[in-house]
Amino acid sequence: YDAFAPAFGKYVEELKKSDMPACERKYTPANVKTGYTSASQVQYVARCGNFRDGGYEYTGALRVLKVIFSYDYLWINVRVKGGAYGCMSGSYRNGDMYMVSYRDPNLRKTNDIYENAADYLEHFDVSDRDMVKFIIGTIGDMDTPMNPAAKGTRSFGAYICNTDYESLKKERGQVLDCNVERIRELAPLVRCAMDENYFCVVGSSKEINKESELFDKIQPLIKVQG
């Protein structure tokens, strides 16, 4: 850092200081459920939404939920029972939430699993020992060792997103204080996000067309110029 700071400071001083008008995003968001067909025999099934649209706020318990989904609900239902190569989920401070499967032989079945996630959380019940494991896994993700480049990326991201130390401290406290009841309280957030039903699939033409009622639009992933 001692070597970086003076060099970067000089770079900043040389940047143009003229005021630039703020740009406006002039577009209307649209929810177009799209199926992208390809020669693949497996699917990549994604569904997302935003829980802040329903008036809910971000909490550190959502980081614990990601671990729970990764090792329990999504892993067991999408990966173990469903046969997908993998699955993932996540939530952001701006309210965005997603669930994704990859190299998945299923389509509708996986979408149903996403839809039922809130029901799973309403009845979530694990032992104190398992809850501690989920929290430890979450802290492990938060405290992953980083090289200088990774630290710089994290700090720059925090700066751009206006995430201060107090916000991170609050999030960590919410992770450490998480329990079964806190996870159950996330059910409305997940239901809100999944009910927005931003849905996209890349996969087999046969499978996507078989479930065509799930989509507003179906088109080739790669358009061949003829």
Where do the language-model regions lie?
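His/Glu-based metal-binding/catalytic segments typifying zinc-dependent metallopeptidases
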Residues: D2-N77, K223-G226
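Short, flexible coil/linker elements and helix-boundary hinge sites characteristic
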Residues: G9, D19-M20, K26, D125, ...
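M16 family metallopeptidases and their MPP-like homologs
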Residues: V42-V64, S70-V180, L186, D195-G203
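Context-gated lysine
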Residues: K10, K16-K17, K26, K33, ...
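Generic intrinsically disordered, low-complexity segments enriched for polar/acidic and small residues
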Residues: Y1, A5-F8, K33, F156, ...
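Short amphipathic alpha-helices in soluble, non-transmembrane regions
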Residues: A3-G9, D112-A117, L214-D216
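In a subset of proteins, long, contiguous C-terminal domains/tails are tracked
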Residues: D177-G226
